[in-house]
Amino acid sequence: MRRGPRSLRGRDAPAPTPCVPAECFDLLVRHCVACGLLRTPRPKPAGASSPAPRTALQPQESVGAGAGEAALPLPGLLFGAPALLGLALVLALVLVGLVSWRRRQRRLRGASSAEAPDGDKDAPEPLDKVIILSPGISDATAPAWPPPGEDPGTTPPGHSVPVPATELGSTELVTTKTAGPEQQ
């Protein structure tokens, strides 16, 4: 059961139709469409260079000498747009760095000019960072920690952590509710 050679058109393709000079044949929809919808140059009028009108079997209208000019925007978008975006980001980063550096320089200059405005080293120190203790007697004999009443190793903790009851089965629900003082 051998089949003959397959057609390039496919089984359900319509018969080749000639297109008018203002239209180009589109292989995707297999019909004549306006050439402006395709990225092809306008078809040349039939003259000495074209022996017959173009048909569906002659898709040279969609690929030809003008295909290079139509494909130019694609590499420009693929390489040009990311390059411009990268340059814009680098420029923004440089500007942010310059602004922060200038602010830091101003702050350092302002601090140095505030320390010695007249060059007088005997000037009183500003009281911005001086801590003033309240008057009173400090109790130097008070212990830092109260003495332990009981040994913490032998006393049970005041709270309990719920653990799963494995002897009842693995499907038992364990809640985090703790026992209050009335239940102990």
From Swiss-Prot:
Ranges of biased composition (kind: Basic and acidic residues): 118-128
Signal peptide (from-to): none
Gene Ontology BP term (one): positive regulation of B cell proliferation
Region of interest called Essential for TNFSF13B/TALL1/BAFF/BLyS binding, as start-end residue ranges on this chain: 26-31
Segments of this protein annotated with the region Disordered: 43-62, 107-184
Side of membrane Cytoplasmic, spans: 100-184
Phenotypic consequence of C35S: Abolishes a disulfide bond and thereby changes the specificity, so that both TNFSF13B and TNFSF13 can be bound
Subcellular location: Membrane
GO cellular component: external side of plasma membrane; plasma membrane
Chain positions of TNFR-Cys repeats: 18-35
Transmembrane segments: 79-99
Result when mutating C24Y: Abolishes a disulfide bond and thereby changes the specificity, so that both TNFSF13B and TNFSF13 can be bound
PANTHER family the record matches: TUMOR NECROSIS FACTOR RECEPTOR SUBFAMILY MEMBER 13/17 (PTHR20437), TUMOR NECROSIS FACTOR RECEPTOR SUPERFAMILY MEMBER 13C (PTHR20437:SF2)
Function (record text): B-cell receptor specific for TNFSF13B/TALL1/BAFF/BLyS. Promotes the survival of mature B-cells and the B-cell response.
Record's disease association: Immunodeficiency, common variable, 4: A primary immunodeficiency characterized by antibody deficiency, hypogammaglobulinemia, recurrent bacterial infections and an inability to mount an antibody response to antigen. The defect results from a failure of B-cell differentiation and impaired secretion of immunoglobulins; the numbers of circulating B-cells is usually in the normal range, but can be low.
Protein name: Tumor necrosis factor receptor superfamily member 13C
Organism expressing this protein natively: Homo sapiens (Human)
Gene for this chain: TNFRSF13C
